[in-house]
């Protein structure tokens, strides 16, 4: 028996007459009431046998099934709580997307650090599992977007030494009760509980583990019951399936997952889950794509659906071989089966992906090249590719809106705008990337090698070219490429984790002396405008910084703000009767604030601290202004706008936001007006210190715009309607900011816009600098400041006209040179003519002359000696001369190099004196190439 076998000997199983058996097909152990049953009941050991014969008494819609589940657990003393967003990185910094309901409570609740919102609780949590993307459509049961109905109970062992160390105590319920709830729910819905099997499948993940049970009914996994009670421990008593050892924790958690879509499917018995979940959309897509089956074909498709569970890429090594087996079982050719089911599989995937996009974009994810934005873009482009391939011509934004409407999102207009913008970007990406793929295909075709998978993934990552496009282009150029069935899962896995925590930037690191010090009392929160204080020196640590001796001073209390949250540290002085130390930096580590000084006060001495008041005030103004500008941006641009980064300075601040397009000048002015209205309203800047659960319940997860602070208690800053978890210093009233001026915007990366602004005196100074530049320009142009724009536009148009005229004259000169007007040597090459000529001009002159010659069917060999020796060689299509090779030989004669494609190349070298000699050798070089 395995280490956890005893964990499955539940009182409920024995009381209800279950038997424990081993599946002869897969070897899994399972519990059943049916003494005659041999197999576990899960595909591929069994087929779906509820298709056309629903497994429940009543047919349910998604909404009805969700309500039936939640009401059942409410009737059994669970509190219903609202679902969290699908973007888990809005309240966690270790993951990107919500993949299970337990994500809502990790790691703080599951570890016992903070209490759950209710105990026990029930929830129906929208989730997205990118790793299932390649299975969607094929297996009949996989959906990338789904709702995990769940009930959770958080328990702590009663025999631990210090029960107060955890936010909950005692046992609510455990394994037997959990299985009993599931069994009773199935029974109430009319399931034949004799046909239900409970498969033992220990769970490991994220350093935790425990026994788990898969609930299988008529070939379909309906639920997983996880009992999280162990943690990874090299000295643990239990070795589990991942090869690691585990020991029991003081806390233990009931973590269940009931797939809403699958329960709904079971109640309806449709051919696949997709007809049960998206009936209207599937019908629309089939009509739009012109999919129409005869009665025989419809029957064949439905029979294939019963067997589609065998196409799970996680269970089979070769999906196409599995499809061959299904075709054999159905008595048809694989090609006929594929022609019928593959378009339908694409339709299913489109519907699912549109729902996934509705969740992502509706919850404020903005497509980009990183994080959740990357994943959203990947799904969107795959959906567009599938739609084009199967012949769906309805605009993608309309398809996504169908799902957003059903999910009842209020920001549907923004969602549609984002989709339209992304579709256009995708079209441009394909146009730019096609030539690159063609060159790559030609390269590997010449080698006789297939294009490697790493190259295909890199093409997708860096250029957005999907593998199917690579496959098509490669075939046109005689190159092979093998695309694995789980390609998109592999790509998603690369981008599915949040970035690791960055260095905390502390001065002292893990210094043992710091660890022994008490936390510093922070005075700046209660009196942010005060700049002087007194304190006791607790410790002074001498350090070497680039050859200079500096000191880290720890005090019992401080007014100095340590660097953090994008706000620089305060500066100032620490003084005693004997020492006046300059404070140049302040950092915090483990609650201890360290003041970097150039001199050392004595340990145990009283010191007088003096903050640089002007610097502190400007930093406070810019920090509060950052909150205001962020709120104003959301008011103007939409609720999807979220902070992507911020840095407050003395002269200005920058605020990065996630937004799908460039911010227009008119939008900048509107943001500025909204922000300054908040300033002139002179609103109080409030702070409070609620428990984390209370803060999230009252204000949602947008409080974490600036990052996710640790601990059970949060500091919240409220400015009007805007509420943020924030540890920075702020003004007391918005009127203390004075004014806010947005200085510039820029696109710092795809999907991220940067707003640079100044507040207070810094805003006035920035405005004056801009005015100075305007007045200086007006003086140079000899016009009034008001006339500068029109004058600049007139000069620009004149400059463009003159540039065009210069180009025309250059072309005329090139034509004259090309037709013998400038002393070029004509060389007879036997069937074609070459012109070898020195043209002392810039590279544009050389290219223009070469192009003119080639258009007349003449080989051009041109040289210039302005600053260095430069060559351009151009060859007509029908001439067997390699321009790159010619340039290489010429450039070698002037001490340089060069090359290029066979039809046009350039190069050169530093030896100008050898230019004419090199050109004299050109005729012989050309003839030797033709003879070769």
From Swiss-Prot:
Domain remark in the UniProt entry: Consists of three domains; the N-terminal catalytic domain, the editing domain and the C-terminal C-Ala domain. The editing domain removes incorrectly charged amino acids, while the C-Ala domain, along with tRNA(Ala), serves as a bridge to cooperatively bring together the editing and aminoacylation centers thus stimulating deacylation of misacylated tRNAs.
UniProt-annotated location(s): Cytoplasm
Known role: Catalyzes the attachment of alanine to tRNA(Ala) in a two-step reaction: alanine is first activated by ATP to form Ala-AMP and then transferred to the acceptor end of tRNA(Ala). Also edits incorrectly charged Ser-tRNA(Ala) and Gly-tRNA(Ala) via its editing domain.
Catalytic activity: tRNA(Ala) + L-alanine + ATP = L-alanyl-tRNA(Ala) + AMP + diphosphate
Binding-site residues for Zn(2+), renumbered to this chain: 623, 627, 726, 730
Residue stretches of biased makeup (Gly residues): 894-910
Top enzyme category: ligase
Cofactor binding annotation: Binds 1 zinc ion per subunit.
Residue segments, region Disordered: 893-916
SUPFAM superfamilies: Class II aaRS and biotin synthetases, Putative anticodon-binding domain of alanyl-tRNA synthetase (AlaRS), ThrRS/AlaRS common domain, Translation proteins
GO terms for cellular component: cytoplasm
Cofactor(s) demanded: Zn(2+)
Record's keyword terms, sorted: Aminoacyl-tRNA synthetase, ATP-binding, Cytoplasm, Ligase, Metal-binding, Nucleotide-binding, Protein biosynthesis, RNA-binding, tRNA-binding, Zinc
Name of the protein this chain belongs to: Alanine--tRNA ligase
Enzyme Commission number: 6.1.1.7
Family stated for the protein in its record: Belongs to the class-II aminoacyl-tRNA synthetase family.
GO molecular function: alanine-tRNA ligase activity; aminoacyl-tRNA deacylase activity; ATP binding; tRNA binding; zinc ion binding
Gene that produces this protein: alaS
GO BP of this protein: alanyl-tRNA aminoacylation
């Amino acid at each position: 028996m395995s280490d956890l076998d005893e964990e499955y000997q539940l009182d409920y199983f024995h009381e209800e007459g279950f038997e424990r058996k081993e599946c002869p097909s897969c070897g899994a152990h399972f519990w059943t009431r049916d003494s005659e049953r041999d197999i576990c009941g899960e595909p591929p050991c069994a087929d779906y046998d509820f298709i056309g014969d629903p497994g429940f008494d009543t047919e349910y819609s998604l909404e009805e099934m969700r309500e039936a589940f939640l009401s059942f657990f409410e009737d059994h003393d669970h509190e219903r709580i609202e679902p969290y967003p699908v973007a888990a990185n809005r309240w966690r910094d270790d993951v990107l997307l919500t993949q299970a309901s337990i994500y809502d409570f990790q790691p703080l609740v599951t570890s016992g650090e903070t209490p759950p919102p209710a105990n026990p609780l029930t929830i129906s949590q929208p989730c997205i599992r990118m790793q299932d993307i390649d299975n969607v459509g094929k297996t009949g049961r996989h959906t990338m977007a789904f709702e995990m109905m769940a009930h959770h109970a958080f328990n702590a062992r009663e025999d631990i030494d210090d029960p107060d160390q955890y936010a909950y105590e005692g046992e609510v319920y455990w394994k037997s009760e959990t299985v009993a709830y599931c069994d009773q729910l199935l029974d109430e819905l009319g399931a034949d509980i004799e046909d239900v099997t409970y498969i033992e499948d220990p769970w490991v993940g994220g350093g935790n583990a425990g026994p788990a049970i898969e609930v299988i009914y008529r070939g379909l996994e309906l639920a997983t019951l996880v009992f999280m009670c162990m943690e990874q421990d090299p000295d643990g008593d239990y070795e589990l399936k991942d090869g690691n050892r585990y020991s029991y924790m003081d806390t233990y958690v009931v973590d269940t997952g009931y797939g809403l879509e699958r329960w709904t499917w079971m109640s309806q018995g449709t051919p696949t889950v997709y007809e049960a979940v998206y009936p209207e959309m599937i019908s629309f897509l089939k009509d739009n794509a012109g999919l129409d089956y005869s009665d025989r074909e419809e029957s064949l498709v439905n029979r294939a659906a019963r067997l589609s569970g065998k196409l799970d890429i996680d269970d089979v090594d070769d999906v196409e071989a599995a499809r061959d087996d299904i075709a054999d079982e159905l008595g048809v050719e694989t090609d006929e089966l594929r022609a019928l089911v593959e378009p339908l599989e694409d339709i299913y995937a489109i519907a699912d992906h549109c729902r996934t996009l509705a969740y992502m974009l509706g919850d404020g994810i903005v497509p980009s090249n990183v994080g959740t934005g990357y994943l959203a873009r990947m799904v969107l482009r795959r959906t567009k590719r599938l739609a084009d391939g199967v012949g769906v011509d309805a605009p993608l934004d309309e398809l996504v809106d169908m799902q957003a409407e059903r999910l009842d999102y209020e920001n549907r207009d923004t969602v549609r705008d984002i989709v339209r913008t992304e579709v256009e970007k995708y079209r441009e990406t394909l146009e730019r990337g096609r030539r690159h793929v063609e060159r790559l295909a030609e390269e590997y075709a010449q080698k006789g090698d297939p294009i490697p998978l790493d190259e295909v993934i890199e093409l997708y990552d860096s250029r957005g070219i999907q593998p199917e496009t690579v496959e098509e282009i490669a075939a046109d150029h005689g190159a092979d490429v093998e695309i694995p069935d789980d390609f998109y899962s592999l790509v998603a896995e690369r981008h599915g984790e949040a970035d690791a925590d960055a260095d905390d930037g502390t001065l002292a690191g893990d210094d043992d002396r710091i660890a022994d010090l008490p936390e510093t009392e922070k005075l700046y929160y209660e009196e942010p405008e005060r700049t002087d204080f007194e304190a006791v020196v607790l410790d002074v640590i001498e350090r070497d910084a680039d050859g200079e001796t500096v000191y880290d001073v720890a005090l019992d209390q401080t007014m100095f703000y340590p660097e953090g949250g994008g706000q620089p540290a305060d500066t100032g002085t620490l003084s005693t009767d004997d020492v006046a130390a300059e404070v140049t930096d302040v950092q915090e580590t483990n609650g201890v604030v360290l003041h970097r000084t150039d001199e050392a006060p004595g340990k145990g001495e009283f010191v007088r601290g003096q903050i640089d008041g002007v610097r502190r005030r400007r930093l406070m103004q810019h920090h509060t202004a950052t909150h205001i500008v962020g709120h104003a941006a959301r008011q103007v641009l939409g609720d999807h706008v979220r902070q992507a980064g911020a840095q407050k300075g003395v002269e200005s601040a920058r605020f990065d936001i996630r937004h799908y397009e460039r911010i227009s000048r008119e939008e900048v002015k509107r943001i500025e007006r909204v922000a300054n209205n908040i300033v002139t309203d002179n609103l109080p800047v409030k702070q409070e210190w609620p428990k984390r659960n209370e803060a999230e319940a009252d204000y949602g997860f947008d409080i974490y715009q600036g990052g996710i602070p640790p601990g059970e208690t949060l500091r919240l800053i409220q400015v009007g309607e805007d509420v943020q978890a924030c540890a920075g210093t702020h003004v007391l009233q918005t009127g203390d900011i004075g004014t806010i001026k947005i200085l510039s915007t820029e696109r710092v990366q795809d999907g991220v816009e940067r707003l640079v602004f100044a507040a207070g005196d810094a805003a006035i100074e920035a405005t004056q600098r801009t005015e100075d530049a305007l007045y200086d320009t007006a003086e140079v142009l000899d016009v009034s400041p008001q006339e500068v724009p029109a004058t600049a536009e007139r000069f620009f148009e004149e400059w463009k006209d003159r540039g065009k005229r210069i180009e025309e004259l250059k072309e005329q000169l090139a034509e004259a040179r090309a037709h013998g007007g400038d002393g070029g040597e004509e060389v007879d090459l036997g069937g074609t003519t070459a012109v070898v000529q020195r043209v002392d001009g810039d590279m544009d002159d050389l290219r223009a002359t070469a192009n003119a010659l080639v258009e007349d069917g003449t080989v051009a060999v041109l040289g210039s000696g302005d600053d260095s020796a430069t060559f351009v060689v151009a060859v007509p299509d029908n001439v067997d001369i390699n321009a790159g090779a010619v340039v290489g030989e010429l450039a070698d004669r002037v001490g340089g190099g060069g090359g290029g494609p066979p039809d046009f190349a350039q190069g050169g070298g530093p030896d100008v004196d050898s230019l004419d000699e090199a050109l004299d050798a050109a005729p012989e070089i050309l003839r030797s190439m033709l003879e070769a």
